[in-house]
Amino acid sequence: MPAIVSCLTTSYGRFGGQAAVEHLRAAGLESLELPIRTAGTGSPFGDEPLVTTDSSLADLKRVERLFDDHAIRIASCNVTSGNPLDRGVVAITKRKLELAHHLGVELVVGGAGEADELQSLAQLYRHLTEIGDYAAGLGITYCFETHPGICQNHHRMLETMNALEHPHLKLNFDTANILYYNEGVNGEIALAKVCHHVRHMHLKDSLGEYGQWHFPALGYGGAVDFVRVLEIMRPCGFNGPYSIEIEGLAGEGELSLKEHQRRIIDSVEQLQNCGYFD
């Protein structure tokens, strides 16, 4: 059975969501991961958001028409907003969950946060449980990013999952971030340890060097065994979304839309060769 393969719109760099909607089908995909941005905040990629926390019902209808016109579906939303230890981030996250629900999305990706002291960690857990309960009421599962903090590596992911035990708080495993944020980690072994908690994945390649910003088209980094990733996840009952994420290389200049599209096409071809579409 073919997996659900999508693409995070920031993979198109400064061309963003509009370009993703217009060009993904030509790259062989029909689904994407849509960021819902916090109004008034900039994007590190320089792209214009399709949806923000200030989006009106009319704005959402325009976005839905855009997707319908290009026969593209939203597989998930990215609702990253900051550290949920902050009460304000919880409120923003709830707003983003409401917007995702309006768009018919059942999976979102967002930060799990970080806390240095036991008292702060207990508060973070309470805030995440509140987010999970709110997501559950909307029929959504919130999937934690592989970012610094309580989901930085597989050890902390398991600790967090066991502490929360919430059916609507799960993991988004990022195949490159696990190497970028941790030294001496085997990414596929880490994935195997937590695969039963994974409900969403970011497929991202790298050189495998700790702290080195090098996230090219899939297959051009060499540190991630995408065949092995599929072999691990299929027996766990996971069939996607596998969301392609390409963040580029440190020091490279701005790419043209054609160059971004080439990276997406190359990534799709890599996954085809690895059996994701079989």
Where are the language model's segments positioned?
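A structural motif
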Residues: 29, 105, 198, 238-239
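Active-site beta-loop-alpha junctions enriched in small/polar residues
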Residues: 8-12, 35-39, 79-82, 112-115, ...
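Active-site acidic/histidine proton-transfer and metal-coordination neighborhood
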Residues: 18-19, 25, 60-74, 79-171, ...
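C-terminal helical cap(s) of enzyme catalytic domains, especially alpha/beta-barrels
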Residues: 256-278
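Acidic/histidine-rich catalytic cores of soluble enzymes
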Residues: 3-5, 21, 32, 100-102, ...
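A short acidic, helix-capping loop that chelates divalent metal ions and anchors anionic groups
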Residues: 41-46, 83-85, 114-119, 180-182, ...
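Glycine-rich, proline-tolerant flexible connector loops at the mouths of alpha/beta enzymes
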Residues: 35-62, 115
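A short, acidic, flexible beta-alpha connecting loop/helix-capping segment that sits on the rim
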Residues: 12, 243-262
